């Protein structure tokens, strides 16, 4: 799969801004977007941003509970440094099987 790691600094507002930019970039490529939040707090924080209101935002647990990957889409992982090894392998395996682009943000 296509994989990129996007590193950046900043608190919750900075993370939302970075996420909105990545979503816009993926949309400009004609891709559907799925967002995986680091935890429930981040998930709620992202859902409050109007720019992300139409996006599917799930938690990391969804990876291990059978996340459905949309072929040809983009999956954006918030705070990717918090993924476990098993979650990372599940993500990359699913992405490879469904030709999914993966963008992982690293909050530094």
Per-region residue spans from a language model:
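Conserved ATP-binding/catalytic motifs of P-loop helicase motor domains
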Residues: 1-108
């Amino acid at each position: 799969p296509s994989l990129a790691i996007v590193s950046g600094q900043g608190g919750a507002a900075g993370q939302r801004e970075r996420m909105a930019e990545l979503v816009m970039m993926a949309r400009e490529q004609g891709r559907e977007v799925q967002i995986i939040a680091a935890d429930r707090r981040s998930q709620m924080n992202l859902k409050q941003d109007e720019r992300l209101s139409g996006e599917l935002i799930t938690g990391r647990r969804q990876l291990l509970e059978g996340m459905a990957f949309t072929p040809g889409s983009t999956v954006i992982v918030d705070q990717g440094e918090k993924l476990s090894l098993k979650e990372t392998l599940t993500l990359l395996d699913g992405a490879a099987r469904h030709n999914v682009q993966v963008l992982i943000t690293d909050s530094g």
